[in-house]
Amino acid sequence: MSYQEIKSIVALVSTLLINGLYGWYVFWRYQQEAPGVAELFRFWAVAMLIFMGVALVAQILITVVFRAAYRRITGETEPSFADELDRTIGLRATRNAYYAFALGLVVALLTQVLSLPPVALFATMFLAGIASEVAQALTQLYYYRRGV
């Protein structure tokens, strides 16, 4: 397996793990606090802002650990350049991530058109973010395996 394939798998697993654990924690807290209508938007705003920080720090730590482990296990350093193939795959993965997030955003807005509770809006937006990261990692893995 190439460095890029392993990196895509690590990104996919870490995304699912970080988002899954944080999502479980937030929904557990939501049930414990049972915020009323007045506090609902504040609850979700705080939860999402904290998540951005937690996810950023976790991704940085995972990247550092991955690079160190890769270097230690294989004895190779990660490629210091990106060729045309890497750029093309990166662009396609980013495009698919945007599509996944845009679709999730439309579904989130539809929850309000259908008069679902506001928690459905926030949960759908949270899931759209996860779907976009997963789409990006899967697209990269697919194209590194199959080729462009």
Language-model features, listed with the residues they occupy:
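Cytosolic-side membrane-entry/anchor segment at the start of a transmembrane helix
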Residues: 1-31, 138-148
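Membrane-interface helix termini and inter-helical loops of multi-pass transporters
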Residues: 28-41
